[in-house]
Structures are given as structure tokens and as C-alpha cells.
């Protein structure tokens, strides 16, 4: 048995004066799984999340829509109707029975959508009418419609109400999705925002919408229940900024205005390949130093890198995506330095309620049963 005290990822973490009190620092990263039929969370999600829940752990849900215009992928969950809230309740209860904290990620895709996903076949909404350039994947996103200034308060209110609904469903807090090229980032980054009004142009103006969402959600449920995910360095869905350091720093300044803000969850720059090995860029340190609360790092971490960044104080917590997807008992495997199941890309976004979802084996089930990587 490995001495847990020697493994930084498995050391406890207690937020000073806050609600995060963890037995380890291995978090489940938010990952879209496309298995919430008709946007309604399903009973099989309770098994998926509880498989990955441990006493003193922290899980973040898959991205969860705040309204009927927030959709851009098949069968993703929502939290904007009474039906959604009631469907989430038993899932949240099941995670809590395992002793874990559960955070709901609130999401609006903006232009990462097609007319088919939108009410009455209308155009997706965004900061601008700039269409995402086709990337060869076969997906062609529809040309978006630029939001009018007088429409923006309604979108802000959608986030506020979704946050209230998430708390009613029993979640311990929410994570505002301000990353990965979705609506908030479409406003924040200069490549996707060509507005000339108070929501475009300067850095402050481009961040205005995101700040209004943060302020509204904090006002509704309290800063101690609100986290955010940001990815200033990423170039995802044609969403890139000419000065990511300034963008990240400005947003951290805004978060610091809310005393007791739950956490700041940031995505590393794209991994580089050095001498044939993946190498994380480690670009988040200035933001980590500037942010006054709990900091979470994400982006391609493994056991070795995760331990390293906890040990040297680069971050408080590390979120794991694909490794946790394929290894429901990931903290235990890290503890024992056990072999990991390989994830199967082919089943990331399929709608099967079992295959590639809840059928990845636990260590004590079958030591040798690994799912082939695609």
C-alpha cells in the first residue's frame, strides 16, 4: 500500500472558510456524454456519477444547458425546466450518499450549434454573426445571429435561474462554463467578437457579458456556491484571443471582487509534443497567484504531472477528464499506481446508456480487462 501522505494528489484539501472539504484532490472534470434523452437527465447518470464518487471527492457534471437556445449537441442535459430539476434530484442524492460534493456546470453553446437544435429552427445566437470555419470533421455549424443589446439581460437571467434550479435540485454549487469556445468565450475573445457597442472592442467590454453572468449568479445563490471554468489560452471552436494573459488576468480580477468565490477552474494551453512526449505548457501560474481562492488546473494531466503541480503549489486541485471517464476508481488506481483502462473515443458521445459509459471495469473487478483506445 502506498503511503498516501507521500502522494500529493491524495492529500486532503480544506478551503479556508469555504465549503470545499476534500479527502483527495482528484476531481472529475466536466465532460459531455450525450446520454440525457430529450435534455432530461436519466437514471443511468446516477450510476455513472456514483461510480466515480468517493467520500470527500468532488465531481463536476457534464455541461448542462441553461435554456432551449443553449443546445448544440445531441441528448445533453438541461436545468431550465421543472422536469429537469426533478430528474436531477435522485442523481444528486445518489452522489451525496457516497459522500462526495457535486457541482453543476452551467452552459450555453452560443454559435456552436445548428438551426436543428434551436427553437423553431432559428439561428444560434452569439456575440457576432461570425460562423465557425468547418474543420474537416463533417460538422457544419450554422451561421449565428448577433445578440441585440436588449436581448442580453435575458441570457444573463437564464444563467441566474438555472443556478437557482441547480441548488433546488440539491447541487452543492454551480460552475459557470466560460471556456472551450462557448457563448461566454465568444464574447470574451477578440477573434469571435467584432461588436462595436458596450459588449465589444475593449477587454473590459468583451468581458462585460461574462461578468454580468457571474454577478447575477452570485447574487442569486451566493459566491460560496459559484465557480467558473476559463480557458484564455485555448483556440477551440475558432475562439482565440490575441492576448490571453491579459484576458485571464482581467477575469481573475473580477472573480476576486466576490469574497468567498467557490473556485477558479482553468484549462492549460494546448499540450506540446517534445521529443515524442506530451508536455503540459504550465501557463496558469500568474492566474493562480492572482486568484484569492481555490484554484483548479485542467488539461491533459496524469498521475505524475498531477502530483507534481500539487506538490509545488501550482494548483490546489486537479481535474481529470478522459482518465476518470475510463477509470471510475481513478483515485484508488493512483494510490496503488495500478494500470489504467484505456478510453475508447468511439463511445464518448454515443447515446448508449451502458457501453462506454458505465461498463469501464473497476480495479477489483478485472485487472486485465482494458478497453482499447481508438
From Swiss-Prot:
Q: Provide the residue positions that the database annotates as binding substrate.
A: 177-180, 270
Classification via InterPro entries? Aldolase_TIM, OxRdtase_FMN_N, Oye-like
Q: Which SUPFAM superfamilies does the record match to this protein?
A: FMN-linked oxidoreductases
* Lineage, opening ranks: Eukaryota, Viridiplantae, Streptophyta, Embryophyta, Tracheophyta
List the protein's name: Putative 12-oxophytodienoate reductase 5
Binding-site residues for FMN, renumbered to this chain: 30-32, 63, 105, 229, 300, 321-322
A Pfam family that this protein carries is Oxidored_FMN
Organism name:
Oryza sativa subsp. japonica
Q: One GO MF term, please?
A: FMN binding
Q: Which cofactor does it need?
A: FMN
Q: What does this protein do?
A: Putative oxophytodienoate reductase that may be involved in the biosynthesis or metabolism of oxylipin signaling molecules.
| Transmembrane intervals | none
Q: Which domain of life is it from?
A: Eukaryota
Supply the EC number(s): 1.3.1.-
Q: Which family does it belong to?
A: Belongs to the NADH:flavin oxidoreductase/NADH oxidase family.
Task: Provide the active-site residues from the annotation.
Answer: 182
Question: What keywords appear on the UniProt entry?
Answer: Fatty acid biosynthesis, Fatty acid metabolism, Flavoprotein, FMN, Lipid biosynthesis, Lipid metabolism, NADP, Oxidoreductase, Oxylipin biosynthesis
User: One GO biological process from the UniProt record?
Assistant: jasmonic acid biosynthetic process
Amino acid at each position: 500500500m502506498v503511503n498516501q501522505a507521500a502522494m500529493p494528489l491524495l492529500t486532503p484539501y480544506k478551503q479556508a472558510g469555504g465549503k470545499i472539504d476534500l479527502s483527495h484532490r482528484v476531481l472529475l472534470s466536466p465532460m459531455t456524454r450525450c446520454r440525457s434523452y430529450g435534455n432530461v437527465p436519466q437514471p443511468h447518470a446516477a450510476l455513472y456519477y456514483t461510480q466515480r464518487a468517493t467520500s470527500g471527492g468532488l465531481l463536476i457534471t457534464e455541461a448542462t444547458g441553461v435554456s432551449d437556445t443553449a443546445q448544440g449537441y445531441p441528448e445533453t442535459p438541461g436545468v431550465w425546466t421543472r422536469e429537469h430539476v426533478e430528474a436531477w434530484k435522485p442523481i444528486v442524492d445518489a452522489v451525496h450518499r457516497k459522500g462526495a460534493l457535486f457541482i453543476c456546470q452551467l452552459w450555453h453553446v452560443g454559435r456552436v450549434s445548428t438551426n436543428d437544435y434551436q427553437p423553431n429552427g432559428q439561428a444560434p445566437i452569439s456575440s457576432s454573426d461570425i460562423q465557425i470555419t468547418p474543420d474537416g470533421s463533417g460538422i457544419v455549424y450554422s451561421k449565428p445571429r448577433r445578440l441585440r443589446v436588449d436581448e442580453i439581460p435575458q441570457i444573463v437571467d437564464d444563467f441566474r435561474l438555472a443556478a437557482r434550479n441547480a441548488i433546488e435540485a440539491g447541487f452543492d454549487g454551480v460552475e459557470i462554463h466560460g471556456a472551450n469556445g462557448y457563448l461566454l468565450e465568444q464574447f470574451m475573445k477578440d477573434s469571435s467578437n467584432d461588436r462595436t457597442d458596450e459588449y465589444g472592442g475593449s477587454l473590459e467590454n468583451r468581458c462585460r457579458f461574462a461578468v454580468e453572468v457571474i454577478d447575477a449568479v452570485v447574487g442569486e445563490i451566493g459566491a460560496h456556491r459559484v465557480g467558473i471554468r476559463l480557458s484564455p489560452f485555448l483556440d477551440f471552436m475558432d475562439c482565440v484571443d490575441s492576448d490571453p494573459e491579459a484576458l485571464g488576468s482581467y477575469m481573475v480580477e473580477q472573480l476576486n471582487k466576490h469574497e468567498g468565490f467557490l473556485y477558479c477552474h482553468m484549462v492549460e494551453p494546448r499540450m506540446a509534443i517534445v521529443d515524442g512526449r506530451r508536455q503540459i505548457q504550465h501557463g496558469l501560474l500568474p492566474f493562480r497567484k492572482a486568484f484569492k481562492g481555490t484554484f483548479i488546473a485542467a488539461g491533459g494531466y496524469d498521475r505524475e504531472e498531477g502530483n507534481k503541480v500539487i506538490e509545488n503549489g501550482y494548483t490546489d486541485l486537479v481535474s481529470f477528464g478522459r482518465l476518470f471517464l475510463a477509470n471510475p476508481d481513478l483515485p484508488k488506481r493512483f494510490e496503488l499506481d495500478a494500470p489504467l483502462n484505456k478510453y475508447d473515443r468511439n463511445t464518448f458521445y454515443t447515446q448508449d446508456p451502458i457501453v462506454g459509459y458505465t461498463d469501464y471495469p473497476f480495479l477489483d473487478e478485472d485487472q486485465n480487462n482494458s478497453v482499447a483506445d481508438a
